UniProtKB/Swiss-Prot annotation:
Residues 29-38 have a biased composition (Acidic residues). It comes from Human papillomavirus 7. The keyword Transferase does not apply. This is Protein E7. Belongs to the papillomaviridae E7 protein family. Plays a role in viral genome replication by driving entry of quiescent cells into the cell cycle. Stimulation of progression from G1 to S phase allows the virus to efficiently use the cellular DNA replicating machinery to achieve viral genome replication. E7 protein has both transforming and trans-activating activities. Induces the disassembly of the E2F1 transcription factor from RB1, with subsequent transcriptional activation of E2F1-regulated S-phase genes. Interferes with host histone deacetylation mediated by HDAC1 and HDAC2, leading to transcription activation. The lineage of its organism: Viruses, Monodnaviria, Shotokuvirae, Cossaviricota, Papovaviricetes. Residues 39-51 have a biased composition (Basic and acidic residues). Homodimer. Homooligomer. Interacts with host RB1; this interaction induces dissociation of RB1-E2F1 complex thereby disrupting RB1 activity. Interacts with host EP300; this interaction represses EP300 transcriptional activity. Interacts with protein E2; this interaction inhibits E7 oncogenic activity. Interacts with host TMEM173/STING; this interaction impairs the ability of TMEM173/STING to sense cytosolic DNA and promote the production of type I interferon (IFN-alpha and IFN-beta).
Length: 111
């Protein structure tokens, strides 16, 4: 800009908007208080339903979950999709945080 006052002619709008990918491959860990709250809700619902859930009840609660981890041997990215209940995916999470490791197809073929 030149002069004491800016004018419309002094402002150059030559920048074009660029597309930005808003996808993120990172998953946020829920806080312990959220986990406790969810677990309390699950416990109270289980206490209300003392009888065994039917196969149809289990199918209603099934969901697909994506698991992204690294191969224990070559450290390449391994993606899995599992179909289970929220309770089961918590158990899988605990196992993966412990001693359970995933092996990629290439390393599995040579093992």
């Amino acid at each position: 800009m030149h002069g004491e006052r800016p004018t419309l002619g002094d402002i150059v709008l030559d920048l074009q908007p660029e597309p930005v990918s808003l996808s993120c491959n990172e998953q946020l860990d829920s806080s312990d208080s959220e986990d406790d709250h969810e677990q309390d809700q699950l416990d109270s619902s289980h206490n209300r339903q003392r009888e065994q859930p039917t196969q149809q009840d289990l199918q209603v609660n099934l969901q697909s979950f994506k698991i992204v981890t690294h191969c224990v041997f070559c450290h390449c990215l391994v993606r899995l999709v599992v179909h289970c209940t929220a309770t089961d995916i918590r158990q899988v999470h605990q196992l993966l945080m412990g001693t359970l490791n995933i092996v990629c197809p290439n390393c599995a073929a040579t093992a």
